[in-house]
Each structure stands twice: as C-alpha cells, then as structure tokens.
Amino acid sequence: MSSSMLNFTASRIVSLPLLSSPPSRVHLPLCFFSPISLTQRFSAKLTFSSQATTMGEVVDAGMDAVQRRLMFEDECILVDENDKVVGHESKYNCHLMEKIESENLLHRAFSVFLFNSKYELLLQQRSATKVTFPLVWTNTCCSHPLYRESELIDENCLGVRNAAQRKLLDELGIPAEDLPVDQFIPLSRILYKAPSDGKWGEHELDYLLFIIRDVNLDPNPDEVAEVKYMNRDDLKELLRKADAEEEGVKLSPWFRLVVDNFLFKWWDHVEKGSLKDAADMKTIHKL
C-alpha cells in the first residue's frame, strides 16, 4: 500500500470514529447482530475506507462529517415498485441520481406527520448540512428504515414504525417511550422520484405515518434547523410563500405531494379521531 493510501486510510479512521459510534449505527453485513471484536471493527474500517476510495468519495470532502458518515454507514432497503424487498444499498448510492437513473434504485422510506393535542402539525426545516434538500421545510420526520432485522418486519408495518421511533429520537430528541410504536398509524404509501441538484436526489417508496401525541422536543442541529407547529391556516400561508418564492421558503417534494393529494382531508380525520378509517395500505400511489 502506498504512503498516500496509508495517509488517506488513517485520515478516514480518525474522521469517522466507528469505535465510538452507537451500536444502532454499526451495520456490518452478516454479523451486525453478533459481538464484534476490536480486530473486526478495525478491519471493517479499512474496508469502509477502501469502498469510499473506490466510489470517489474524495470529491465529497466538503460534505459535513456527520452526514458523510451516515451516507456510508446506513444501508437502505431496496424494493421494487410493489414494495417487495430486493436487496440493500448504501444511503450514498441510493441518493446518487446517476445510480437512480442507471440502475433504477428504489428504496423504502417513511414520512411521519406528528400532531399535538391541539391538532397542530409539527414541521421541521432540514439543516443546512443535509445532502439532499437542505433548508427546505417538510413534515415532522422523513427518513429510511435500515436493512436490519428490527426494521425489515413487514407485519403491521412494524419495521417502518420501529425506524420512525428511532429517527424521531435522533432528529428531534423525542424519547422512544413517548412514541409507542403501536401509536403510529400507517395511512398509505407513495412512490415518487425527485432530483435535489445535479448530483443528488430521491427515489422512494414512502410510508406515510400519522401520530397524535404531545411531546417534548430537543432538535439535533446536525439534522434540523428549525421546528414549528402549524395549524391549517399557518400551513396554507407557508404554501403561499413557497409558491411565490417569498423569504426563500422551499418545501420538500414529498411533503408537497402529500399536501396536494392527501393532507387536508386526512387532517379532518385527525380532528374527528377517525384516522384509521382513512388508511389504505393496499394502494401504492405513483405520484
């Protein structure tokens, strides 16, 4: 191995501290449910560094360190257009438009819509360091179930619910005990594709999860720039600003699709306590 490669590998090990990462963020093929020795962890880091070099990640040196780590640690669930699991791939590859277009990579995702007891919807503005759609306003939490046993459970959408509980803690600091998985109500699924810029984008089969809870928030600045509860009129004003391009307001494409096609009629069910009557998990809406 050349000295330059050794220096690059060492720099990756220093900048991406896998040994200190929480267990939930260590995803190693075939063995991530077994104890991992220090030797195995070190070997995994070398492999990780090699993969990053192969994929040309050097050109992304300006990417935020936290987001870069998640891009390679997180393994998304690949599905076909009928939501059948067909494999897994790094978050990095799943969001490269080149890969999306050339290999038709489609991954499973979820979007949480959390309402408080006043039936106000919690929105977040994505952080400036997000790789896709930075600083756009969107629903409460948008992310991906990972290719791990607990988040691959299809029965009653349990895998996706588990993932939603995990990410609401990670992004908004909401403890798991405040968001019981059985309180998430899956309403439907959408399939969409949306470029973010010339390099990155989304191609997702997205589960839409609603929940009504009063919660305490402690947003993670690596993920979230701002949070705000909105009633219907507040949201309509936000939509108006986005349409008029006022104050730099932008909305995520998946949130706008849900707003335009479903949200306000589902909001009626939120207020009536009849959300389960609106559920249709048999249909995948191609938007």
Curated annotation (Swiss-Prot):
<dbReference type="GO" id="GO:0050992">
    <property type="term" value="P:dimethylallyl diphosphate biosynthetic process"/>
</dbReference>
<feature type="active site">
    <location>
        <position position="142"/>
    </location>
</feature>
<dbReference type="InterPro" id="IPR011876">
    <property type="entry name" value="IsopentenylPP_isomerase_typ1"/>
</dbReference>
<protein>
    <recommendedName>
        <fullName>Isopentenyl-diphosphate Delta-isomerase I</fullName>
        <ecNumber>5.3.3.2</ecNumber>
    </recommendedName>
</protein>
<dbReference type="GO" id="GO:0004452">
    <property type="term" value="F:isopentenyl-diphosphate delta-isomerase activity"/>
</dbReference>
<feature type="domain" description="Nudix hydrolase">
    <location>
        <begin position="105"/>
        <end position="257"/>
    </location>
</feature>
<keyword id="KW-0149">Chlorophyll biosynthesis</keyword>
<comment type="function">
    <text>Catalyzes the 1,3-allylic rearrangement of the homoallylic substrate isopentenyl (IPP) to its highly electrophilic allylic isomer, dimethylallyl diphosphate (DMAPP).</text>
</comment>
<dbReference type="GO" id="GO:0015979">
    <property type="term" value="P:photosynthesis"/>
</dbReference>
<comment type="pathway">
    <text>Porphyrin-containing compound metabolism; chlorophyll biosynthesis.</text>
</comment>
<feature type="active site">
    <location>
        <position position="207"/>
    </location>
</feature>
<comment type="similarity">
    <text>Belongs to the IPP isomerase type 1 family.</text>
</comment>
<keyword id="KW-0414">Isoprene biosynthesis</keyword>
<dbReference type="InterPro" id="IPR000086">
    <property type="entry name" value="NUDIX_hydrolase_dom"/>
</dbReference>
<keyword id="KW-0602">Photosynthesis</keyword>
<dbReference type="InterPro" id="IPR015797">
    <property type="entry name" value="NUDIX_hydrolase-like_dom_sf"/>
</dbReference>
<dbReference type="GO" id="GO:0015995">
    <property type="term" value="P:chlorophyll biosynthetic process"/>
</dbReference>
<dbReference type="GO" id="GO:0005737">
    <property type="term" value="C:cytoplasm"/>
</dbReference>
<comment type="pathway">
    <text>Isoprenoid biosynthesis; dimethylallyl diphosphate biosynthesis; dimethylallyl diphosphate from isopentenyl diphosphate: step 1/1.</text>
</comment>
<dbReference type="Pfam" id="PF00293">
    <property type="entry name" value="NUDIX"/>
</dbReference>
<keyword id="KW-0413">Isomerase</keyword>
<dbReference type="GO" id="GO:0009240">
    <property type="term" value="P:isopentenyl diphosphate biosynthetic process"/>
</dbReference>
